[in-house]
Swiss-Prot record:
Residues the entry annotates as binding IMP: 16-19, 41-44, 131, 145, 225, 240, 304
The EC number(s) this enzyme carries: 6.3.4.4
Reaction catalyzed: IMP + L-aspartate + GTP = N(6)-(1,2-dicarboxyethyl)-AMP + GDP + phosphate + 2 H(+)
A biological process from GO: IMP metabolic process
SMART domains: Adenylsucc_synt
Name the record gives this protein: Adenylosuccinate synthetase
Domain of life of the native organism: Bacteria
Pathway membership: Purine metabolism; AMP biosynthesis via de novo pathway; AMP from IMP: step 1/2
Subunit structure: Homodimer.
Described function: Plays an important role in the de novo pathway of purine nucleotide biosynthesis. Catalyzes the first committed step in the biosynthesis of AMP from IMP.
Source species taxonomy: Bacteria, Bacillati, Mycoplasmatota, Mollicutes, Entomoplasmatales
Species, as recorded: Mesoplasma florum (strain ATCC 33453 / NBRC 100688 / NCTC 11704 / L1) (Acholeplasma florum)
Enzyme class: ligase
Entries under HAMAP family matching the protein: Adenylosucc_synth
Gene that encodes it: purA
Length: 429
């Protein structure tokens, strides 16, 4: 076997960290780009040839015609939305790379979307903040062994099996939420039509990825959302329904963990969060409003304004531990230009005691107060910086403090949305 050259890129906060920008950057070097978790609830924007492209489930490598993009078995796939997304990208004039889809990936179906919306509405004041795209119910069905996988469509008795599950889901929606039924034949026809568009892409992607790595290919694993939204290690219950940490790259792809040799955690220079859940460093003032506007902190899918706060290193160190992060990449550093005083949370205060971890329960996390380190900001425009040495002293100190407290090397930072506004301080792929 040749030398392993693989890299996992994961978000190290609550999502929206700029993973798409980094996976797009590394996709220029990679031979294969793999999505290993999540569904089309995690939109990100890629700037390519002067155009902005919003992608949700398709790996970022699709914009490089020399790259093979893989949707792994850990993903939840809405085939109809996938086909629409591919058509939109094609119609913009982009020459697409090769796409492979795991035959073991779970399918998001129309009843999952209905259940997602009905469940969220029924929670009242205890809403989780789901995007209502059917992700949670899809993973619920997976665990309950009611899920339908891509490979199942080729089974001879698929229509009968699908109809049985469909009728069960309709009964559940009617009895629990009084939701009107949808038509089975139309749902089935739409699913088959979408499948026929992509069926040549369907394969055992685990075998493909394993062979690519063993043959010396550069393989990039693209995480979705963020480590703090992980179903096991995130800020439960305000999490997503899949494992978003880097440790799931092997399980969600179908390869050995021994074939992955580097993990990059992408983190904003500040913190953001969407929906409910504890946020000890949240800024509910003009400073936070300014960061939101300069950073364009609105959901790429939902357009919802994101909650904004100071950088939380307690949360970041939690992500580093649970994902085994080797390097950090800091995004949106330019957004902090002009902020006179910068605060970094290095520990929490819970019931008068200092702690350096995220409590397991949301009630205790809500009670945590942030303990801050104060650092002077910088006024200079850094959007044209090409090297670390060109940064203002205070910006250098800010990055160095993050690396010092987290005990993880920073491999680069971004000073704007364009691919060329990416500064690499250490090559890791």
């Amino acid at each position: 076997m040749r030398e392993i050259n693989s890299l996992v890129v994961v978000g190290s906060q609550w999502g929206d960290e700029g993973k798409g920008k980094m996976t797009d950057y590394f996709a220029q070097k990679a031979d294969v780009v793999v999505r290993f978790a999540g569904g089309d609830n995690a939109g990100h924007v890629i700037n390519f040839n002067g155009q902005k492209h919003k992608v949700t489930i398709i790996p970022s490598g699709i914009f490089n015609s020399e790259v093979t993009s893989v949707i792994g078995n850990g993903c939840a796939v809405n085939l109809i939305n996938l086909v629409k997304e591919l058509e939109t990208i094609k119609n913009s004039g982009v020459k697409l790379g090769k796409l492979l889809i795991s035959d073991r990936a779970q399918l998001i179906l129309p009843y999952h979307i209905l259940i997602d919306g009905a469940q969220e509405e029924s929670r009242g004041a205890r809403k989780i903040g789901t995007t209502k795209r059917g992700i949670g119910p899809t993973y619920q069905d997976k665990a309950a062994r009611l899920g339908i996988r891509v490979a199942d469509i080729e089974e001879e008795d698929f229509k009968e099996t699908f109809k049985e599950i469909f009728e069960y889901q309709m009964m559940f929606l009617d009895r629990m939420f009084n939701v009107e039924s949808i038509d089975f034949e139309e749902t089935y026809a739409n699913l088959i039509n979408a499948y026929n568009v992509i069926k040549d892409c369907v394969t055992d992607t685990g075998i493909f990825v394993e062979q690519a790595i063993k043959n010396g290919k550069k393989v990039l694993f693209e995480g979705a959302q963020g480590a703090l939204l992980d179903i096991d290690h995130g800020t439960y219950p305000y999490v997503t329904s899949s494992n978003t940490s880097a440790n799931n790259a092997s399980t969600g792809t179908g390869i050995s963990h021994k074939l992955i040799n580097n993990t990059l955690g992408v983190v904003k220079a500040y913190s953001t969060r969407v929906g409910a859940g504890a946020f000890p460093t949240e800024l509910l003032n003009e400073v936070g409003d300014g960061i939101r506007e300069r950073g364009h902190e609105y959901g790429s899918n939902t357009k919802r304004p994101r909650r904004v706060g100071w950088l939380d290193l307690v949360a970041l160190k939690h992500a580093i531990r649970t994902s085994g992060i080797d390097y950090l990449f800091i995004t949106l550093l330019d957004v902090l230009s002009g902020v006179e005083e910068l605060l970094i949370c290095d520990k929490y205060i819970l019931n008068g005691e200092e702690i350096n971890y995220i409590p397991a329960t949301s009630s205790k996390h809500e009670k945590c107060k942030a303990n801050y380190i104060s650092m002077p900001g910088w006024k200079e425009d850094i959007t044209k910086v090409k090297h670390f040495e060109e940064l203002p002293l205070n910006a250098k100190n800010y990055l160095n403090k993050i690396a010092e407290i987290c005990e993880v090397e920073i491999s680069g930072f971004s000073v704007g949305p364009d691919r060329l506004q990416t500064v690499i301080t250490k090559e890791i792929m």
